[in-house]
């Protein structure tokens, strides 16, 4: 089954008025597609436009200052990482890759007084950059910036190539190469790079000279392709870089298309590389560790052995092929609305458990969800309606109590009507600039509602609302009428539109199919790139998406969510959830058990709101739902608990107490259940996005019934 069928391709729900964004992108001259807001190249059109963009393994930075002009290429080896704040501590809090190390800067003599950067074709995996002189003239350098690109490729038209380096050049050597020109460039840091040149005209020549230790020059205007790549150091290279790079030099990837199929518990997806130049050759593209774990045998055969370090995701290896085929098995088809055991045991509810759950539900159902969710934040209101939806779900599907269910469902529908009719404190609008659904809260204050107006955290926010709507649809199918369906579908299209044929929204705004997880940062400039603070709210969105598919009998949506959850599981357990045996992350941080805030250029065992250990851990647990154990395995939960949480669990008492214990139920549901059932588990230990009803039902349903 093709799972990338559009949700809908028609106009957006008229309940959302149209409005331009207060901060339009810079330098986007034209675009055939809705502008991506949460992708790796965002720094090219935001703020100063001079912060890096990480395509992995390379990063590129536009320079237009007093010293350098053009597009700088950087690559940082593992040995250059900076650990801190005390590099000798075990574990360290963070590490980052140093900035401003511009190995080679693609430029032109005509850029001596400045250059312009224009952008177009903003797509899921790529964007096209064009450099031109600030003075009159028609010369350009067109550079497709593509995730995983093996070369940084620039097509020159009528410009005189110049190359600079902030690290400084040591030597250059011309090497015989039959298809064009090749130079071996050594920098003063000992690193070696290759530069290839392919003139369009066979009569043209390309002669590169070392003008100074900071500049390589040519003497004539040039039209044709120039490609630059780094020779790996011996610690990661077990092949012959000359041979491998030579075989693919002259062809370059301009964009990547995605396709995906699901059959039962197996999902497959493909990256197909559109190419230019010598298109008869196989392009060279670098794969991340989680890609290599999932490659089919038809792709594994093209591994070259050429490796370069990524910034935060381990060593990447180059594959010379026009298509990647990836397979994910054991999709979470068994996961639905109700808890299931992840560590053995039965999900049968004992009379004792049912009595405790009923007592909690009888109290929680009286919660005033209508007024409590009348807030200025889509995120916080979403947590509250989702929490109450869980109470209603338990009343109906676990307790079978129609009185409690009807009482709760009536109030939940009333609370959700405020959002489906868009009459909350800060209504949503359709942004005609970036083509998305945003809160009006940030038009006067960009960081209002956690930056929702500027595309921060949409999958976090919408996930809670979609979950609540899915529960209503399950308990009362008559609620699934046009206006309510269109509300949910608009949120889905905004965050996870699966197809470029839906031209009203960017394709997969939050989820990054290349790195395998979402990015929460929207259109804010950042020296370390986009980031994600809460992995659990990432998969909560996909879980809610699946549940909505279930109540709508939408098998495409269900299967797409299942596949994305499997990809996310692979990615999170490769890069973010760590144990002492993890090999991808450096040993200096493994003792944190979770990377913390994951940026494109660093990881920081921290949160944006607290330095407390329980927050650093808990932000990757909230909310605990039936899907949690699929991504956070019982083994991982046990090791993390023993090392990081058990030493602190009795040293504090607040809403994070319940969050940590609910996560522990994945491994030890009986102890978690007994904790929740005890008289000492008071209301102050329950988060506003959870309830005692849900905690008891979750732990019992995971196998913890007494």
Curated annotation (Swiss-Prot):
Fill in the subunit field for this protein. Answer: Interacts with scd2. Interacts with lsb1.
UniProt lists the family membership as follows: Belongs to the glycosyl hydrolase 81 family.
Using the UniProt annotation, give all residue ranges assigned to the region (May provide specificity for triple-helical beta-glucan). Answer: 602-604
Instruction: Spell out the temperature dependence recorded for this entry.
Output: Optimum temperature is 50-55 degrees Celsius.
Protein function:
Cleaves internal linkages in 1,3-beta-glucan. Promotes the release of spores from asci by degrading the ascus wall. Independent of its glucanase activity; required to establish bipolar cell growth by promoting localization of the scaffold protein scd2 to cell poles and thereby the activation of cdc42. Together with lsb1, plays a role in coupling the endocytic coat to the actin cytoskeleton.
Regarding activators and inhibitors, the annotation says: Inhibited by mercury ions.
Any one Gene Ontology BP term: fungal-type cell wall disassembly involved in conjugation with cellular fusion
Using the UniProt annotation, give all residue ranges assigned to the region (alpha/beta subdomain). 233-330
**What is a single cellular component term in the Gene Ontology annotation?**
cell surface
The record's listing under PROSITE patterns reads: GH81 (PS52008)
- One Pfam short name: Glyco_hydro_81
State the PANTHER family in the record. Answer: ENDO-1,3(4)-BETA-GLUCANASE 1, GLUCAN ENDO-1,3-BETA-D-GLUCOSIDASE 2
The enzyme class is: hydrolase
The annotated active site, in chain numbering, is 457, 533, 537
Q: Does the keyword Hydrolase apply?
A: yes
Ligand binding ((1,3-beta-D-glucosyl)n): 461, 531, 533, 537, 614
Outline the segment boundaries, as ranges, of region: beta-sandwich subdomain: 1-232
Gene symbol here is eng2
What taxonomic classification does the UniProt entry list for its organism? Eukaryota, Fungi, Dikarya, Ascomycota, Taphrinomycotina
Specify the protein name.
Ascus wall glucan endo-1,3-beta-D-glucosidase
Q: Where in the numbering of this chain does the GH81 domain appear?
A: 1-703
Q: How does activity depend on pH?
A: Optimum pH is 6.
Record's keyword terms, sorted: Carbohydrate metabolism, Cell wall biogenesis/degradation, Cytoplasm, Glycosidase, Hydrolase, Polysaccharide degradation
GO molecular function terms listed in the Swiss-Prot or TrEMBL record: endo-1,3(4)-beta-glucanase activity; glucan endo-1,3-beta-D-glucosidase activity
Q: Which residues cross the membrane?
A: none
Reported EC number(s) for this entry are 3.2.1.39
Q: Which reaction does it catalyse?
A: Hydrolysis of (1->3)-beta-D-glucosidic linkages in (1->3)-beta-D-glucans
Q: What happens when the gene is disrupted?
A: Severely decreases occurrence of ascospore release from ascus during sporulation. Decreases sporulation-specific endo-1,3-beta-glucanase activity. Abnormal endocytosis. Following cell division, decreases levels of bipolar cell growth in the population. Leads to monopolar localization of myo52 and bgs4 to the old cell tip. Leads to abnormal localization of scd2, scd1, and activated cdc42 to cell tips. Decreases interaction between actin-organizing protein arc5 and endocytosis protein end4. Stubby cells with abnormal actin cytoskeleton organization.
| Source organism of the structure | Schizosaccharomyces pombe (strain 972 / ATCC 24843) (Fission yeast)
């Amino acid at each position: 089954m093709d799972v990338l069928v559009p949700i809908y391709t028609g106009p957006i729900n008229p309940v959302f008025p149209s409005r331009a964004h207060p901060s339009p992108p810079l330098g986007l001259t034209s675009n055939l597609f809705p502008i991506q807001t949460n992708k790796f190249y965002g720094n090219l059109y935001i703020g100063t436009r001079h912060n890096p963009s990480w395509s992995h393994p390379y990063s590129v930075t536009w320079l237009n200052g007093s010293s350098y002009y053009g597009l700088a290429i950087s690559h940082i080896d593992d040995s250059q990482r900076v650990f801190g704040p005390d590099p000798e501590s075990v574990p360290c809090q963070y590490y980052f890759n140093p900035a401003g190390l511009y190995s080679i800067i693609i430029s032109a003599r005509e850029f001596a007084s400045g250059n312009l950067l224009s952008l177009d074709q903003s797509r899921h995996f790529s964007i096209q950059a064009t450099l031109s002189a600030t003075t009159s003239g028609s010369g350009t350098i067109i550079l497709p910036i593509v995730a995983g690109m093996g070369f940084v490729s620039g097509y020159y038209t009528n410009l005189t190539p110049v190359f600079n380096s902030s690290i400084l050049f040591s030597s250059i050597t011309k090497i015989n190469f039959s298809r064009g020109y090749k130079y071996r460039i050594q920098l003063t840091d000992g690193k070696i790079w290759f530069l290839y040149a392919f003139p369009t005209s066979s009569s043209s020549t390309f002669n590169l000279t070392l003008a100074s230790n900071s500049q390589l020059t040519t003497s004539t205007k040039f039209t044709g392709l120039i490609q630059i790549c780094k020779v790996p150091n011996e610690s990661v290279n077990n092949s012959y870089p000359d041979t491998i790079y030579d075989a693919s030099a002259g062809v370059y990837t301009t964009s990547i298309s995605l396709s995906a199929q699901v059959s039962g518990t197996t999902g497959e997806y493909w990256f197909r590389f559109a190419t230019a130049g010598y298109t008869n050759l196989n392009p060279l593209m670098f794969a991340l560790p989680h890609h290599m774990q999932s490659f089919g045998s038809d792709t594994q055969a093209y591994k070259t052995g050429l490796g370069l370090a990524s910034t935060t995701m381990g060593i990447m290896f180059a594959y010379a092929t026009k298509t990647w085929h990836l397979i994910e098995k054991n999709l979470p088809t068994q996961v639905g609305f109700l808890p299931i055991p992840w560590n053995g045991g039965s999900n049968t509810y004992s009379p004792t458990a049912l009595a405790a759950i009923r007592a909690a539900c009888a109290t929680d159902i009286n919660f005033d969800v209508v007024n409590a969710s009348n807030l200025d934040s889509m995120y916080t209101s979403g947590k509250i309606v989702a929490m109450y939806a869980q109470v209603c779900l338990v009343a109906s599907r676990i307790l079978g109590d129609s009185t409690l269910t009807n009482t709760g469902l009536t109030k939940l529908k009333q609370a959700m009507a405020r959002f489906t009719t868009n009459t909350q404190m800060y209504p949503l609008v359709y942004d005609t600039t970036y083509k998305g659904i945003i809160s009006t809260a940030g038009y006067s204050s960009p960081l209002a509602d956690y930056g929702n107006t500027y595309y921060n955290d949409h999958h976090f926010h919408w996930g809670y609302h979609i979950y609540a709507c899915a529960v209503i649809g399950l308990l009362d199918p008559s609620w699934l009428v046009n206006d309510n369906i269109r509300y949910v579908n608009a949120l889905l299209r905004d965050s996870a539109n699966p197809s470029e044929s839906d031209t009203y929204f960017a394709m997969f705004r939050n989820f990054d199919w290349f790195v395998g997880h979402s990015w929460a940062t929207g259109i804010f400039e950042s020296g370390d790139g986009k980031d994600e603070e809460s992995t659990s709210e990432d998969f909560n969105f996909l879980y809610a998406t699946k549940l909505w598919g279930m109540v709508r009998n939408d098998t495409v949506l269900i299967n797409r969510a299942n596949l994305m959850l499997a990809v996310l599981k692979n990615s999170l357990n490769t890069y973010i959830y760590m144990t002492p045996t993890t090999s991808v992350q450096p040993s200096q941080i493994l003792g944190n058990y979770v990377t913390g805030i994951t940026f494109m250029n660093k990881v920081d065992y921290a949160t944006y709101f607290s330095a407390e250990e329980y927050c650093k851990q808990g932000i990757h647990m909230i909310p605990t739902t039936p899907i949690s154990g699929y991504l956070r395995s019982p083994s991982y939960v046990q090791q993390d608990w023993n090392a990081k949480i058990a030493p602190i669990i009795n040293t504090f008492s607040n809403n994070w107490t319940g969050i940590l214990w609910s996560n522990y139920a994945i491994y030890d549901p009986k102890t978690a259940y007994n904790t929740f059932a005890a008289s000492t588990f008071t209301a102050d230990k329950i988060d506003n996005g959870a309830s005692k009803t849900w905690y008891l039902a979750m732990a019992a349903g995971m196998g913890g019934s007494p």
